[in-house]
């Protein structure tokens, strides 16, 4: 078991990549604190965690709320004694160019994606410094590297996450804290399906996205979770400041 006895916090654990990662981490021996604003989704994830013979806790709230982040980390450490892994998987997208995106939507995308990475890292790092080790895994996107159409807020936010990941890796490497980003391709999750549904005719958009990958298919959340497990575990003990593309060859094609 690659995470036996470890304590992990995963934001965005109510669905998609966050859920798949929580279940895999639990199956590999970690206790997983689940964070999401969707209580029903979290309950389903916790049931899946327990079905995998693991255990976890539920924490309902807004990942862009710094007080919530601080309280959740403090509660987890108080009950479990340490914090080994933080994975910031919560994400949000609104679509639109810089001209058509509403300012409120832009702020919401940055609050969830960038704020949800910064605030949870800010809460977790002091505990990891006290321990002398820890792994932080952030969620970027292949679009932050390649660019993309009609998704300016999301792409800009994911680019900020890559820069934040690198600077945290430099700032805290000497403390034994590793910080890495995963840049997924188009992964078959509820958020991806919602993004297609915004179009008047979703099917051509869906097919174009699928075919953009060298592998000519969408990724599965479980495939991204395997990459996250690698970054969480000692198998990546000399890996920090990297952006790991799990993109079916999107960037190469």
Predicted stretch roles:
Residues 2, 80, 118-121, 129, ...:
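C-terminal substrate-recognition "lid" of short-chain dehydrogenase/reductases
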Residues 7, 14-16:
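Conserved glycine-rich cofactor-binding loop
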Residues 87, 173, 178, 239-241:
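Short, small/polar-rich loop/turn modules that mediate ligand/substrate recognition or access, typified
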Residues 97-98, 102-110, 209:
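Substrate-binding pocket helix/loop in short-chain dehydrogenase/reductase
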Residues 121, 157, 165:
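Active-site helix of classical SDR
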Residues 126, 170-171, 237:
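Alpha-helical segment proximal to the catalytic Tyr-Lys
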Residues 141:
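Residue(s) in the substrate-gating loop at a strand-loop-helix junction
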């Amino acid at each position: 078991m690659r995470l036996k006895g470890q304590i992990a916090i995963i934001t965005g654990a109510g669905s998609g990549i966050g859920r798949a990662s929580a279940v895999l981490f639990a199956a590999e021996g970690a206790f997983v604190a689940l964070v999401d604003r969707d209580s029903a989704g979290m309950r389903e994830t916790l049931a899946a965690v327990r079905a995998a013979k693991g255990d976890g806790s539920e924490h309902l709230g807004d990942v862009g709320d710094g007080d919530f982040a601080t309280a959740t980390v403090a509660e987890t450490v108080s009950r479990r004694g340490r914090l080994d892994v933080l994975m910031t998987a919560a994400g949000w997208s609104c679509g639109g160019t810089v001209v058509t995106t509403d300012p409120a939507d832009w702020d919401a995308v940055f609050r969830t994606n960038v704020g949800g990475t910064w605030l949870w890292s800010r809460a977790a790092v002091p505990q990891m410094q006290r321990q002398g080790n820890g792994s932080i895994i952030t969620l970027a996107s292949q679009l932050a590297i390649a660019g993309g159409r009609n998704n300016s807020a999301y792409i800009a936010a994911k680019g900020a996450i890559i820069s934040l990941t690198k600077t945290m890796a430099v700032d805290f490497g000497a403390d034994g804290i590793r910080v890495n980003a995963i840049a997924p391709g188009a992964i078959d999750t509820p958020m991806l399906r919602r993004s297609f549904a915004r179009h008047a005719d979703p099917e051509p958009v869906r097919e174009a996205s699928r075919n953009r990958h060298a592998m000519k298919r969408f990724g599965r959340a479980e495939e991204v979770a395997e990459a996250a497990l690698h970054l969480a575990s000692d198998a990546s003990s000399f890996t920090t400041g990297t952006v790991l593309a799990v993109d079916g060859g999107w960037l190469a094609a």
